[in-house]
Amino acid sequence: GKAAEQYKAKAYADMRELLEDPNVDAVAIATCNHWHCLAAIWAMEAGKDVYVEKPLSHSQWEGRQVVNAARKYKKIVQLGTQQRSDPMQAEVKKFLHEDQALGKVLYAQANRLGPRGSIGKRETPLPIPQEIDYDTWLGPAQDEPLYRNSFHYDWHWDWNTGSGEMGNWGVHVLDDVRNVAYQDSVTTPKRILSCGGRVAWNDAGDSPNVHYVYFDTGSF
């Protein structure tokens, strides 16, 4: 494929072939979202440590299977919320908690604002690019016709393969709150209020592009 032509690293069409290589100690999983959990579990079963991009899963159940596998196979697994490595977050935590510069924190709010254009809406299904092994690309996802204009990237806004903006950027900003404000002591929410929708565009996307979520954790 194009990647094999551009880079000198060995290329694989099927990740399972890579996982069989005993010389590989760890893998970074940067597939489409719908593959994250299964690929991570396969890697751990093969004895590899894992860095898996966010979002980890489509559901709590899927995510728990990855946690269970990490404990079963005693492997290191890191989720791709890379802003935790930013020294600024440590400074903000010190500002809030050690210095108590703002006093007692009672409430935390995260916002993500960014323009996102229409992905289009075709009258006929999108032809799959010839260079794509579509069965392998789909993996655990449903085989459904695609009506968006572009095959690549815009799978984010299809619940079958993506997780919408909440799974794309929401993961990052919510993890910032969990890390900085809660210091990872946040409990499972007692109540969740979620509202929003797909506004402005009548396109093929089925995930919200405007989304408000309130988590009542009772942690503060």
Predicted regions and their residues:
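Short, solvent-exposed loop/turn elements at domain surfaces
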Residues: 2, 21, 116-119, 145-147, ...
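N-terminal glycine-/serine-/threonine-rich beta1-alpha1-beta2 phosphate-ribose binding loop
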Residues: 1-52, 58-76
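N-terminal Rossmann-like dinucleotide-binding module
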Residues: 1-7, 83-86, 177
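A contiguous active-site-proximal alpha/beta segment in oxidoreductase catalytic domains
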Residues: 49-51, 57-136
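Residues embedded in well-ordered beta-strands within globular domains across many folds
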Residues: 28, 106-109, 138, 193
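Rossmann-like dinucleotide-binding domain that binds NAD(P)(H)
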Residues: 135-220
